[in-house]
Amino acid sequence: MSGLTVSIRGRNGAFAIEAGFAAEGGVTALFGHSGAGKTTLLKMIAGTLRPENGRIAVGDFTLFDAQKGINLPPEKRCIGYVFQDARLFAYMSVKRNLTYARWAGHRQATRSFDEVVALLGIGHLLDRRPSTLSGGERQRVAIGRALLSDPALLLLDEPLSSLDHARRQEILPFIERLRDESHVPIVYVSHEIDEVARLADQIVLLSAGRVTASGAAADIFPLIDAESEGGGVLLEGIVSAYDERYKLAEIDLGGASFQLSDAGLKQTMHVRLRVRARDVSIARKIPEAISIRNLLPVTVTGIERGEGPNAHVFLDFRGRRLGARLTRRSVDDLGLSVGDQVVALVKAVSVDRAAIREK
């Protein structure tokens, strides 16, 4: 089995959905505002809601094909589903919840109980009941239960939405380990930009039941920024040096360097950085005697003026997209136009620490 392929049309009551995308592996984030159709699409993949036509497959394993009359029931789809709430059996210990999944999976195990427990850091919880666990612990157990059913695909439906910020930060590293070590394709539903920036390898944007864009996270993420103050772009690079005196890591972005305040990075690490448009300024030339360390040569590729005081300037940095949110007055004062060669100024501290990921 390999990646997920979806090409379907259907309805959930009066709500119509039309979706087509392919996900090769890792984490595919379904992103959109509330009511965009994320959970409806997930239910169609899981088999709890039937599309009207189209096809859904994981590699060469067909889950649904309207033309061929194939519509596997949920229990035959080899899918692990994690809900917004953990839905653990309250009368069972954590260990029994996990071993139940092994029994219910009906497939030959490819990963051991101990491996899954170690992966999610839940060994110390095995004898406890769900009612004694924190929200983050319950979700880790729920993910473990899904993984022990030996799925070909994991569906995570806003698994962190019921948790506060502290609990989210507690569980995110375990989801990253799941992504990097389990080798199970994951479809991750979220409307939280921070989670998508940190976890996603691919992004599928949904709006009013339709896929508006899909592709690699670095390519699609700037489209989110166009609609959100909190968005930005994703840049990937390698830690090329570390300054012990000033506690700054230098990231090689392929011909240009980027300095980042100490975040526990080590030399040769592959990392992903998130740069918000609101933290990018523009200069006509490299300024002298300036405290900002990250100066990137860029080309203006577009200017979008809103009705308010702000404008969004689209930039190209060595084939990668950047954005800057400026006032319209600043755009006019600088005389910016498409094709201009300018300098993007990014504060080192403006890079989202939570979005740093080791590849």
Curated annotation (Swiss-Prot):
Gene3D superfamilies named among the record's database cross-references: 2.40.50.100, P-loop containing nucleotide triphosphate hydrolases (3.40.50.300)
Enzyme Commission identifier(s): 7.3.2.5
Location comes to: Cell inner membrane
Which Pfam families does this entry report, sorted A to Z? ABC_tran, TOBE
Q: Which residues form the ABC transporter domain?
A: 1-233
Its domain of life reads Bacteria
**Reactions it catalyzes:** molybdate(out) + ATP + H2O = molybdate(in) + ADP + phosphate + H(+)
Record-listed ATP binding positions = 32-39
| Disulphide bridges, residue numbers | none
The keyword Transmembrane belongs to this UniProt entry's keyword annotation: no
Signal peptide positions on this chain: none
Topology of this chain in the membrane? Peripheral membrane protein
Q: Which GO terms describe its cellular component?
A: plasma membrane
Keywords in alphabetical order, please. Answer: ATP-binding, Cell inner membrane, Cell membrane, Membrane, Molybdenum, Nucleotide-binding, Translocase, Transport
Keyword Hydrolase set for record = no
Q: Which residues form the Mop domain?
A: 289-355
Q: Name one GO molecular function term.
A: ABC-type molybdate transporter activity
List, alphabetically, the PANTHER family matched: ABC TRANSPORTER I FAMILY MEMBER 10
Q: Which family does it belong to?
A: Belongs to the ABC transporter superfamily. Molybdate importer (TC 3.A.1.8) family.
Subunit and partners: The complex is composed of two ATP-binding proteins (ModC), two transmembrane proteins (ModB) and a solute-binding protein (ModA).
State the function annotated in the UniProt record. Part of the ABC transporter complex ModABC involved in molybdenum import. Responsible for energy coupling to the transport system.
Q: What is this protein called?
A: Molybdenum import ATP-binding protein ModC
**Gene name linked to the record:** modC
